[in-house]
Amino acid sequence: IGLSLHYLEISKAEARRRQEMSRDLELVRERNRVLGFISKYDELTGLLNLRGFTEQTKKFCSSEINQRAYIICGDLDHLKEINDTWGHPAGNFALQSVARILGGCLRSQDTLARVGGDEFLILLNCEEENFQDIFRKRIKDACTVFNAESDKPFLVEISLGIAEFRPKPDTDTQEIIALADKELYEAKKHRRKSVRRPES
């Protein structure tokens, strides 16, 4: 009986040890999941960050081979003016609003990321003719609707640069982003001089 009790105590101790190990492993897994999320997502907007966007782009170029695709650079106009005039909470609100506006104009399979202070990237495929003109108008109209409903003293407006490409596994997406960014730079020359809401 004494020997049986001894083995019973060992079995109980072993069961407790295994339960603790299982709990510890689950905590490690959860921590890794959280760290993985943080490493790929932007905290302010909940969108992918540059690392997450780069990973999605690699997968996209390996699966959507030779389809007509686009990388779009979107930029919140006059973020510095918003921050300097109304404070950083207003700037954060404007950035979150851009995320919602852009997201509302995209499909569920499209990729949207915030990759810098005021810069966003979009990756999508579309065979629609005149896509670039259609998309620019869609974003402009969405901003118009947003600003009409907003009670903020500033306007939220977005400049766009769009680059078309045919994805392949060896596509240099940094080169495509650079082309879109160059067009964005030209587009920003034509933005309004201030985002201060006109007095009625």
Give the role of each language-model region:
Residues R114, C143-S159, R192-R197:
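Catalytic core regions of nucleotide second-messenger enzymes
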Residues H6, D84, L123-E127, F165-R166:
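Residue-level recognition of strand-loop junctions within catalytic nucleotide-signaling folds
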Residues G36, K40, N49-Y70, D77-R107, ...:
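Conserved long alpha-helical elements within nucleotide-processing catalytic cores of c-di-GMP signaling
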